[in-house]
């Protein structure tokens, strides 16, 4: 929880004149937070390196739920190390993040998921911001190209899932993957990626949101015509409910 609090405080800081390093220092030096944060950072650094055991969450018994690099959350752990390096300038965080992210390169070819932004931009994207290394740029561009192949111009969206009884399901979470496409256009000058992301966002704004601006979790489209078939919720209470995490994903529309 201390790590989460750290980054919430950083993200919510309203003083745009302060850089990440300055804001991070002010938090890390806070007397009430420092011992807790230090304990969590040590736990992260000591966590055993394992390509099949990226830490995702804590179980009820206090043990860590580990996942493979294929999981949609895999990029978060190395990404946090890169953010910590930006804040502290301590190389131990950069090097530890590199160790973990090396297991993820193969995911750039995973065309069976829409979670390329979650996985690859939150990890390699942050590493590229730090180093500017061409090999990381290439990984990002390959990831963006893989993601773009899930876009259907008839629907105007990037397909989310390949399972279930839906024809062409698009979930609100998918908004979080568009940043990878915008970055690909910045890096290449090819507007195709930007246009795909923009079209997907406009389609989401049109069909995912109710009159009160709450959102559906899943919109299922006719893959032949692009017409809306169903407005449903897969992870919320019911089809008319507001799934709070999904509502947060949808904030990326703006």
Per-range role (PLM):
Residues 1-5:
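Sec-dependent signal peptide recognition
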Residues 9-12:
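C-terminal motif of bacterial Sec signal peptides marking the signal peptidase cleavage site
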Residues 19-254:
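Glycan-recognition and catalytic cores of secretory/periplasmic carbohydrate-active enzymes
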